[in-house]
Each structure stands twice: as C-alpha cells, then as structure tokens.
Amino acid sequence: SFTPEEICTLTMEFYRRNYIEGLFLSSGILHSPNETMEQICKALRDLRIIHRFNGYIHCKAIPGADPALIEMAGWYADRMSINLELPTEEGLKRLAPNKTRKTILTPMRQIQNGMAESREYLGMKGGNYGAYHFTQERKQKRLAMRGAKDAFGTHAISRGVTSASGAHTVSRGVKGVPGTNADTGGYKISHSGSGDSVITGTDLMRQGKASSGLQLWNSCDTKRGFVPAGQSTQMIIGASGETDYEIMAVSEALYRRFDLKRVFYSAFINVNKDSTLPALDSQPPLRREHRLYQADFLLRYYGFEANELLSPSRPNFNTYLDPKCDWALGHLELFPVEIESADYDTLLRVPGIGVKSARRILAARRSTKLTFQDLKKLGVVLKRAVYFITCSGRMMYPTKLEEDYIVRNLTDPKDRIRFGSDGMSYRQMTLFDDGMFPNGVRQEEKLII
C-alpha cells in the first residue's frame, strides 16, 4: 500500500499535469481500523493544508474507526462513503464476518448528523441533500395541493421525508413494502423468502445512533463544510441470493433515513475463486446491475417508490425491458398521456421522457402546440414514448395499446417500428448490408444511412 507521503506526491504530480481532477482514497484494514483511518486522515490533511490541493476528494470511511477520526476525514474530504456491502445481515455474517451492521451504520449516521449541523451553521438552504430528498419534497408539495392521491391516483401520501432542518418526519407504514407495518405505522425489520433479514426502516435508525455533534470545528485548519458533497454507499449484487425487491427496499430506506447522495451497485465477481465465496453458474450479473441503476434513478429523480416497481410476487426486474417501460406496461390504464396538458410528474412517468425533456416540454408548450417532431427535438425518445403519448389528442400513428404488441416492438432486435399506416418502416443499415438485398430495397422499406 501507499504511504500518506506517496499518495500526496502522486496526487499532486498528476494534478499539476492536469491528468486528474480529484482523488478517490480507499484502503483495506491494516492492523486495525483506527491505524488505517489515521493514515487516511494524515494523507487528507497533508493534501489540503501542506500541498493546498483544491481538487475533489472522495474518501472511504473505515467501519469500526474512532468517531473523531471519521469526523476529521469529513472536514478534508468532499464526499465520504461507507460500503453497506450486502443488504442482509445473514449475508454480511457469511461473506464479511469482520463487519457488522452497527460498525457500518453508526459512522453513516455520524456523517449524516455532521452534514446537517454544518448545513445549519453555514446557512446552506439547498445544502448537500441528495436528489431523492428534493424529489420527495416536490412530491409532497404536489400531493398536499391535490389531496391524498398522487398524479395517477395510485396510492395515498404515506411516507415521511427529510425536512429542511435535517429532521425526519415519519407517517404511517405502507402495506406491502419491506420493513414497514401499515397497522402500527412503525418501520421494522422484514424477512426475505429465504429467511434473511433485510435492513430497512427503524432497524437502520436503531443501528445508526446519533452522535453528539461535530467536535472539530476549529481544529482542522479548513474553512470547508463537513462532507460538502454528501455521502454514498455500495452494495454487492448477486453474492448472497437477495432479490431486486429487497435491494431496492434497502436503497430506498437508506435514501430516506441517511440522506445519501448515491447508492452504487457492483456485480459480484469471484476473483480469487475462494471456496468460501459463492460460485457463479454464469457470467457476472452485469445486466441486473444495469437494471438496478436504472431503478435507482427512478427513485431519486422520477418520484417512483420501490413497491411500485417491484413486489413480493414479482421480486426481480425484467432483463429485456427497462424498469420504467416495465412499470408502464403494467399500468396501461393510465395511458396514453396528453403532452399538452400533463403536469411535470406525470410526464416523468412516460417511457422515453426524462427530467430534461419533461422540463423542455413544459417550457415549449407555453408558446406553441407541440408535434411529435418537436418532441424529438426536445430530446424525447420516441422509440419508447410513441406508445404512451398523444399530441393534441392524436397518437403519432395508429397503434395498439396492448402489452404484447408493445413488448414485441420494444424488444425487436432490429428495432423495426412502423411509422405510418402506409407500411413504411425504418431501420439502421450496417456496414455488412451491401449483399443482403440482391433484388434491391423493397419499396415499403426505407434504410437510414
């Protein structure tokens, strides 16, 4: 491993040559958590104070280290993270017996409380909250204006969100969501089908008890806020038999209870072929990892909840369709959506419409009526959206609002979609198509070159 001096030298040499813009600093445990964290803090302090390094620093906190060392690192780093590793306690005991939920969640809670105290002291209104906080805040304001139902009328207000002061307000539990109890209104630990305990709700709060506050305000020779870029965590996917539903429920609880900026997902790869580690029957679950990232964005930016995307009866994502399309196909009664009148949150739930394109639609339709060509220019992915929207009461072309029909078109390997009742269709020509048309191109088929 590198010494603190070597880390400083390498970082500054790369930084001066404009090879890097920041540093990601992590370490395995050497001798003890405290000794390792001391070395990390020394490297961070030397970079900031001695070398005047002003670049971005993401630092890994070592579970089990002294709270004072965790706080010291937070004053010098932009972002900190503590890996949750696995969503179930049993999986953690089996694959990482040297770690416990308490040693992981306690420093996570300490960092959260320190961030809230720093925000309040510095008067940061927006602060370093994650996207999930602002999405839920917007959602609560909208629901308060409209009543108890959401934009689609699918479920009532039932979740607590983080307030501007950093305090949490919790309402009733939601029926069908792991870790909640609709009768008592309290969050509790849930159990997977295999008997594993899933970390959610009150269990997270109980394991991560609040610290007594920041103690090193004037001791670190820095005017930076405490962890100004927020904190994140990571989970390993496919190592302990957890379902996507369990993983997303844990991620949602972490966003809500610990103000995380991001939850990262890493497909399990058995590198050293250790017999104590699970053996993979196939390739690493990279597509599953991709679907989890897509669903994570739906939680943070689009206002979805874990129990909307998955359920105990359908615990895993569709590998052929992205989670948003899969959700829309299960709720065809809510479509098509009229582009000219739909509000922002309704537009966000349409496949093919993202955050930027939804905002552009709202801005553009104030001055003109939108056509499908306009939507394409605004960034809407018509390949997916065309089945779920209308412009001025008309669809782009006559199509069936049927699940099987839409799935066939969305999963066609050649992406052939008919764009008119005259039979005209489009597809991308490849470099190897020269000899594929001995009789020439058919009149009803147009190739895009």
Question: Where does each model-flagged region fall?
Answer:
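HhH-family (HhH-GPD) DNA N-glycosylase catalytic core used in base-excision repair
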Residues: 151, 155-158, 164, 194, ...
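C-terminal extensions
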Residues: 316-346, 372-449
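Residue-level signature of tetratricopeptide-repeat
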Residues: 364-365
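A structural motif corresponding to the C-terminal lobe/cap of the Radical SAM core domain
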Residues: 93-94, 99, 103-112, 238-323
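Conserved Radical SAM active-site core
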Residues: 1-233, 237-241, 254, 272, ...
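Short amphipathic alpha-helical boundary/capping segments
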Residues: 347-351
